[in-house]
């Protein structure tokens, strides 16, 4: 009824709903990168760290101490998010 009042067709309504849902999904996916946002994001960062370690080990010898000291930091700005990785090695 409101759609008829404001002149919106069903197609326009569904497009609007789809756009809103997509915006929610994108915001949720972006928030998963932030370590304080949820337990899932901590898990994501842990997986990322493990994969980075495996790649670096192909090219550089890493001791257990080096691996323990690897640091991942997520920084958010108004334009983008960055992940900074510090890997000590001998």
Curated annotation (Swiss-Prot):
Gene Ontology biological process terms, A to Z: cell division; regulation of division septum assembly
Annotated keywords: Cell cycle, Cell division
One Pfam family in the UniProt entry: MinE
Coiled-coil annotated residue ranges, if any: none
Membrane-spanning segments: none
Keyword Cell division: yes
Similarity annotation: Belongs to the MinE family.
Alphabetical list of HAMAP family matching this protein: MinE
Role played: Prevents the cell division inhibition by proteins MinC and MinD at internal division sites while permitting inhibition at polar sites. This ensures cell division at the proper site by restricting the formation of a division septum at the midpoint of the long axis of the cell.
Protein name per UniProt: Cell division topological specificity factor
């Amino acid at each position: 009824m409101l759609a008829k009042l404001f002149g919106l067709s069903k197609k326009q309504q569904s497009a609007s709903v789809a756009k809103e849902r997509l915006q929610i999904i994108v915001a949720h996916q972006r928030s998963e990168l932030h370590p304080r946002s949820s337990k899932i994001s901590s898990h994501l960062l842990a997986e990322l760290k493990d994969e980075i370690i495996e790649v670096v080990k192909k090219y550089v010898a890493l001791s257990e101490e080096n691996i323990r000291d690897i640091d991942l930091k997520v920084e958010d700005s108004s334009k983008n998010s960055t992940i900074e990785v510090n890997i000590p090695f001998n």
